[in-house]
Amino acid sequence: MKKLLLLPLAVFLFIQCLQSQQPAIEKEEWTSKPVIHAVSPDYQNEPAVIILDRRRLEFIDDSAGDVREYYTLHKIIRVNNDKGIEYFNKIYLGISDNTDIVDIKARTILPDGKVIVLDKNNIKDMKEEDGSVYKIFAMEGMVKGSEVEFSYTFQKDASYFGREVIQSKFPVLKTHLELVAPSRLVFDIKPYHCSPESKTDSTAGGKTILQYSLSGLEGLEDEKYASYTVNLARLEYKLAYNNATHRGERLFTWNGLAKKIYGNYTYYTESELKKIGSLVKSNGWEKLPNEPDQIMAVENYLKKYFSVRENIDDKDAYDIEKILKNKLASTMGIVRVYSSIFKTLGINYQFVLTADRDNTVIDREFENWNNGDYPLIYFPKENKFLSPTRMDFRYPWIYPSWGACNGLFCKSTSIGDFTTAIAEIKPIPLEDYHESYNNIESKINLNAAEDSLRIDMKQIFGGYSAAYLREGFNFSTEEQKQSIIKEMVKSSIGSESILSSETENAAFENENTFKPFILHAVVNSGDLLERAGNKILFKIGMAIGPQVEMYQEKARHFPIAIEYPHFEERTIEFSVPDGYTIKNPEALKMEQIYKENGEQTMGFVSDYKLTGNKLLVHIMEDYRKTVYPVSQYNDFVKIINASSDFNKIVLVLEKKG
């Protein structure tokens, strides 16, 4: 969280004023004389222990006939050491508007029984780089063994979908979620990665109360190669029925969302279609020989000349005619532009909504519309995708975390003259592993003085790997590009002594044709050499760049997550200097392979050939899946650490005879 601005903000008067206007909602009760809780010695080495995590979502009919939502969070936390104090000495609230606040309370309870109550005048605003605003307040007087207690309630427009992540790095002794709504509104709640006790109370004066409780939720740290957030315990909720207006009819289904999306994106005025027709004709897209060429031409044009901003409320950013004029679109607006162009060209396509698989999922059995955050366009004939809002990815490449997971496909269907869409939940495949790579080709020679190496190196990036680099190069100044090159070379072989460098295929359009991004550099380096008497020690293992080494003392919790399937191929050609021989070339032979049902899914293999004075080293490392189960963790570590072990290989060059 990058802090840009910290402004004092007195909220006390706002809270008092608002409280006088609130409908009757349940107030969070506090113990008038708090004492330090008894906590099991089993938790004494934890930086902090969350004694209570209580949340309440209450839906209320207001005087205007609208439904308002009130959200309450109440936590009590024991801090055991300096790390715990550092983590909880400031409390952040995701509330930006004072008029939304119903109540805020906080206090610190010291081991000697002293209580320090929050002065509400000390609540401040913190503005982020992206413009979002949080409220923040400091917990005063904290020492080891003290407890932090805070609660807040705020109101907002009702959201009929949501998720509450109830697990973090700290253990939680008691978790309680309560959802309160008028009895006509029937909510469903689904737990993920947890098994809470649940009960429903329909006797509370026209309200239904859903309660979910858990005890002893363990704290989980993030792990290397893991999707952390999506694997934490959470509760998702949605409005399933409104028995006052649609009794017995399930609301907010996936089919309902598909129809809504299709309707929003495929309604065009005659004037809009006329403008799009002129755009298509002026660019000659209808004359291109095939569908992929048309798709690529349209995408490259729109991403070159138009800007997209996610949260623009301006209706001009939705109107196709205004978008074509102003070159600025909202997310919905730019999808409408793509849709109208592909309609004009007669290209068959489907709208797709996807989630970021590291954070949440689109669940076929539970229709949480909030999880479908990101739009894609799918072309059934090619079985490929386009990402209309990601300027850094080009067909058929999409942001990797939006794939290898389920998506909502809006499949069009016609009844007479009426066309709509039905939902199909199915996987969004990523491109095959052999299309994405990070390769190195090096030719290495010892200089005449035998104290440094001349390395002629190519770093070759394809597929998803190339997209990130192209973004850096296309949105950078020349000075920034040189800095990127310098860092890439340094990270690869540890030297900044670059004699020459050039890049190839840096333009975004090269993604369409699968051309790799290439950095070609010639470098001098003495860091890979050492002398030991009359021997030369060549640290050839470092010529592939530093590799990850994995050791984990605790048991693995999460499945292994790879951002995208890929391989890394490295070839090294080393000219053995005259008069020398390599004493230990066999050190270059390594093999770690894992197979499922007889088919390789990951591996590391290195080998060599020695022909005359030419040493040719070939290394292949690959990961062909995005997820590996915990049961394969030890095998995964062996392969990851094989590349790290290769880093440590040192060839011994001895004088002949």
Language model features with spans:
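Secretory-pathway-linked proteins and extracytosolic
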Residues: 22-36, 155-159, 163-169, 176-313, ...
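A surface-exposed beta-strand-loop module
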Residues: 104-167, 197-232, 288, 443, ...
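Solvent-exposed beta-hairpin/edge-strand motifs
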Residues: 92-118, 172-189, 472-502, 568-594
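Hydrophobic/aromatic-rich core segments of domains that either
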Residues: 332-421
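Bacterial Sec-dependent N-terminal signal peptides
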Residues: 1-25
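Cysteine-centered nucleophilic/redox motifs
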Residues: 75, 148, 177, 298, ...
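Long hydrophobic segments that form regular secondary structure
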Residues: 416-528
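Early extracytoplasmic/domain-onset interaction patches
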Residues: 21-93, 430-459
